[in-house]
């Protein structure tokens, strides 16, 4: 938060400590070396990461760098669903169950979550339910669209924490 204090004709910008906030950018938030969008990227914080630091001119200073306050909010954008089995599938030549074509970096299949539901898969990122899968796999499972059979084989069958994007 920033406070502007006017003394006569002079204006002073005072930095104040921030309360806990959360990364809201679904694609992650870049930590920069300096408080400038053109500055070198140090790393990326995933959606839902809790951050705390001093805010000045729209930038929060955290440990090793700065993040833009445009992409943080007061409420955690994620709700933990649980630990699921995550498999992968490749392009079959047809549209997803919702009628759209599958997209790398966007599509997952799930048996019961409504189409359009966005979930965060640990270590993968945010994906959208666009397709359905075999009912025998249950509801604590999702199928990640990777688009390439070799990538799917390499992915295998993994277990990951899953969060609902609110």
Question: What are the language-model segments listed below?
Answer:
Residues 50, 56-63, 70-166:
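Solvent-exposed, well-ordered loop and adjacent helix/strand elements within mature globular domains
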Residues 1, 18-20, 166:
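Short intrinsically disordered terminal tails
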Residues 39-40, 108:
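A structural connector/turn signal
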Residues 1-4, 9:
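Positively charged n-region of N-terminal signal peptides that target proteins for export
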Residues 29-30, 63-65:
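Extracellular/lumenal glycan-associated surfaces
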Residues 32-34:
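Core beta-strand residues in small-molecule sensory/regulatory alpha/beta domains
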Residues 8-30, 43-47, 54-57, 73-81:
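SH3-family beta-barrel domains
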């Amino acid at each position: 938060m920033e406070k502007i204090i006017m003394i006569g004709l002079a204006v002073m910008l005072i930095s104040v400590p921030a309360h806990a906030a959360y990364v809201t950018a679904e694609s992650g938030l870049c930590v920069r070396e300096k408080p400038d969008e053109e500055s070198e990227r140090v790393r990326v914080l995933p959606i839902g990461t809790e951050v705390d630091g001093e805010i000045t001119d729209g930038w929060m200073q955290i440990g090793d760098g700065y993040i833009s306050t445009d992409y943080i909010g007061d409420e955690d954008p994620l709700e933990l669903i649980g630990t699921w089995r995550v498999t992968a599938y490749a392009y079959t030549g047809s549209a997803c169950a919702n009628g759209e074509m599958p997209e790398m970096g966007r599509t997952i299949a799930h048996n019961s979550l409504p189409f359009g539901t966005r979930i965060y898969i640990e270590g993968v990122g945010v994906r959208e339910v666009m397709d359905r899968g075999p009912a025998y796999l249950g509801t604590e499972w999702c199928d990640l669209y990777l688009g390439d059979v070799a990538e799917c084989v390499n992915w295998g069958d993994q277990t990951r924490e899953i969060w609902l994007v609110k």
